Design a protein with these regions (language model features):
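Glycine-rich, N-terminal phosphate-binding loop and its surrounding beta-alpha-beta segment
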Residues: 42-101, 105-107
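N-terminal, positively charged regions that mediate nucleic acid binding
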Residues: 1-57
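Conserved phosphate/anionic-ligand binding catalytic regions in large, soluble enzymes, centered on
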Residues: 8-28, 127-136, 199, 211, ...
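Solvent-exposed alpha-helices and their adjacent loops that cap or buttress functional pockets
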Residues: 1-5, 14-17, 56, 70-74, ...
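Glycine-rich, mobile lid/loop segments that gate access to catalytic sites or pores
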Residues: 111-198, 202
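Short beta-strand elements
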Residues: 9-14, 21-27, 78-80, 108, ...
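Conserved small/polar residues in nucleotide/adenosyl-binding loops
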Residues: 224-226
Length: 226
């Protein structure tokens, strides 16, 4: 399924080398101020350019095509689109014959009987996380007052010293290898009683969404009382 959530419902579409990536968000109250400029900071953090990130360069300018009028949300589903411009589809000409390790090429081919779009990973590409970033921007707009986030890269390739991260990445690139890492996110001011028992607990729902990010292979959740 490409749809997630209940009160704040996300629907994602598009492929890595298609014309657009898009997301529709349902459940946003009417009267929330929103503009394309609100997305700039978070989209810039996601944008490639740092060592170890994808060489793909996309402007990622959000086009808000529904659910917004006179700078305010209307209460209708909010639809946001991002154009795909930096595509090199010729690089994937042999993907259907030579599947890439640790990618979804083989599984997608068999799941969809060979009708899937293999270019850049198609619908399974991390390119679609630009839509999740956009959803996060909107979600922060409607959070209760007092909820704050603090996020950092805690570890790369076993190194916990930020000053050593670049060297770890350089060494991995020289060996044509890859390394894992840990991202730490602390949320303060979470309302009491968030979530539902068992299948829709806060931990269950958070982990569910986090694992939709292709690079996420493990999630650890804990409570810290301050």
């Amino acid at each position: 399924m490409n749809i997630f959530g209940h009160n704040f419902r996300l629907a994602i579409w598009g492929e890595s080398h298609g014309q657009q990536i898009g997301i529709s968000i349902d459940g946003i109250p009417a009267g929330v101020p929103l503009s394309a400029e609100d997305f700039e900071t978070d989209l810039a953090r996601r944008r490639s350019g740092a060592r170890g990130t994808t060489p793909r360069r996309e402007p990622d300018i959000p086009q808000i095509v529904s659910g917004l009028y006179n700078g305010m949300t209307t209460g209708a589903p909010l639809t946001i689109e991002f154009a795909n411009r930096d595509t090199h589809s010729q690089d994937y000409a042999n993907v259907m014959r030579h599947y890439r390790p640790s990618h979804a090429d083989m599984v997608a081919y068999h799941k969809f009987n060979g009708f899937n779009d293999p270019r850049g990973g198609g619908h399974f590409s991390a390119r679609l996380t630009v839509a999740l970033t956009a959803a996060g921007v909107v979600a922060k707009k409607i959070l209760p007052p007092g909820v704050t986030f603090d996020t950092r890269v805690a570890e790369i390739g076993g190194c916990t010293d930020p000053e050593g991260f670049d060297e770890v990445l350089r060494a991995a690139a020289a060996e044509q290898d890859s390394v894992g890492g840990i991202i730490e996110c602390r949320v303060q001011g979470v309302p009491l009683g968030l979530g539902q028992p068992f299948f829709d607990s806060a931990e269950s729902m958070i982990a569910h969404l986090l694992f939709s990010v292709p690079a996420v292979k493990g999630v650890e959740l804990s409570l810290i009382h301050i």
